[in-house]
């Protein structure tokens, strides 16, 4: 089936000398993997290696056989060029980290237009703003809405957040956050991209929240792996 859709690049792995295997989250079909022959060749101008940087938003034409095999692009172009993401060291570190998180989190080949729209909007926000220290934390938490384990916030007056059940509790269990960690987590829940500058988190608080979120993903996603770029991200925001 021939399709034309938007796609967000999740990962690109070199195959042999000149080719790539590119994983994309598409608007039309969810997660798809593509084989790009001669991606490193200057002759193939419509499928340049530069198009497949982490979280680049593409317009693609492709043939989807939907047989669980690698698909093929017919045409690829940048949907909306980023102005700063791939040129700013901090922003590029963030997108590498987020792309790793998504690589280990999205597994289903099914359409999720709401999730795609959220990611696209968030990336444009990142590209157009400079006060971004809380961006990765907000995105990780908001992403859990689309992955199916957003915290139950009906009882936030309780002092402990229980990680395995994803809810606030009056009792402390083995998998609960401490009271201090829970208060920080509540603070994060109240943050949105547009109000993140008025609700300042200190660098140590960000480090605590990042650890909480990585652990939370590990509790709720089978086979979730800690991103290799995590330590670099910690250094950036230390």
Swiss-Prot record:
Pfam families the record matches? RecO_C (PF02565), RecO_N (PF11967)
Top-level division of the source organism's lineage: Bacteria
Q: Which SUPFAM superfamilies match?
A: ArfGap/RecO-like zinc finger (SSF57863), Nucleic acid-binding proteins (SSF50249)
Question: Gene3D superfamilies from the entry?
Answer: Nucleic acid-binding proteins, Recombination protein O, C-terminal domain
Q: Which InterPro entries match?
A: ARFGAP/RecO, DNA_rep/recomb_RecO_N, NA-bd_OB-fold, RecO, RecO_C
- A GO BP annotation: DNA recombination
Signal peptide span: none
Write down any Gene Ontology CC term. Answer: bacterial nucleoid
What are the record keywords, sorted? Answer: DNA damage, DNA recombination, DNA repair
Record family assignment: Belongs to the RecO family.
Q: What does this protein do?
A: Involved in DNA repair and RecF pathway recombination.
Q: What is this protein's name?
A: DNA repair protein RecO
